[in-house]
A protein has these predicted regions:
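Patatin-like phospholipase
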Residues: 1-40, 48-265
Length: 265
């Protein structure tokens, strides 16, 4: 009997995308190695780092980076190309994610990065060519990251047209797709209180056992691992939203609705 090929669709979601690292590690710990990977925006970056064998390296940077490390990417003299300095972004991608001369064909399994064509609102799949260029195009959030030119096209963040690339995973060979939607329940998220009691936050030993005994135990363990990972990086007592949070959250309201319709169909 033919073995089903597993696809991993890593969605867009700004800084929430670091949670993808936790999801991948949880899957690998369960003995699940995806045969196909497709990513949109930050999902494309994490997916490429995984296939390049640099996931641990990227995780170390995320955990150890300071506010100064992040601010160095921004161009204070804002121009039409965006706030983020393209040279510094490229340097980050080539030192932390993948080597500059790596092509998608160099990976040991199919990979796709999703971008949006500003000219016609269409979708652009990167399934070949330079990986760094593909990532930059896929995560070029309008106004924040520089627009990427690809021949006659101007490309921006793929989250505008396909936030969670399930359909792309199927198209490049997957039979079953594990989709990671970072925008689920985004609206109203910040209205909830961040401080949760230990009893509310941590499941009891009994509930953990029940989770592992029922059919959904695997998915619950993966979700718990990803949540714990995300909280370990972004735990903060500051309830104030920064400019980036506001802009990214506003932009991601539309992808959330689009994602639901695409995953349903």
């Amino acid at each position: 009997m033919k073995k089903d090929r597993i696809g991993l669709a890593l969605g867009s979601g700004a800084s929430r995308g670091w949670s993808h690292i936790g999801v991948i590690k949880a899957l690998v710990s369960e003995g699940i190695e995806p045969d196909v990977v497709a990513g949109t925006s930050v999902g494309a970056m994490i997916g490429a780092a995984y296939l390049a064998g640099n996931l641990d390296k990227l995780e170390d940077w995320v955990r150890n980076s300071t506010r100064k490390d992040v601010l160095q990417f921004f161009n204070i003299g804002f121009s039409t190309s965006g706030f983020v300095d393209s040279d510094r972004l490229s340097e980050f991608l080539t030192t932390q994610v993948v080597s500059p001369d790596t092509n998608i064909d160099d990976f040991d399994r199919p990979f796709a990065a999703i971008a949006t064509d500003v000219g016609n609102g269409g979708v652009r799949w990167f399934t070949e060519g330079n990986v760094v260029n593909a990532i930059r195009a896929s995560m070029a959030l309008p106004g924040l990251f520089p627009v990427v030119r690809d021949e006659e096209r101007r490309l921006v963040d793929g989250g505008l047209v396909n936030p969670v690339p399930v359909s792309v995973c199927h198209a490049i060979g997957a039979d079953i797709v594990i989709a990671v939607n970072l925008n689920a329940d985004l609206v109203g998220k910040h209205s909830r209180k961040k401080s949760v009691s230990h009893a509310e936050k941590a499941p009891s030993a009994e509930s953990k056992q029940n989770d592992e005994d029922d059919g959904g135990g695997f998915l619950k363990r993966v979700k718990r691992t990803a949540q714990d990972y995300s909280e370990s990086i972004f735990s903060s007592d500051d309830d104030e939203l920064g400019l980036f949070d506001i802009v990214a959250s506003s932009i991601n309201i539309f992808p959330d609705r689009l994602t639901r319709s695409r995953m349903a169909g």
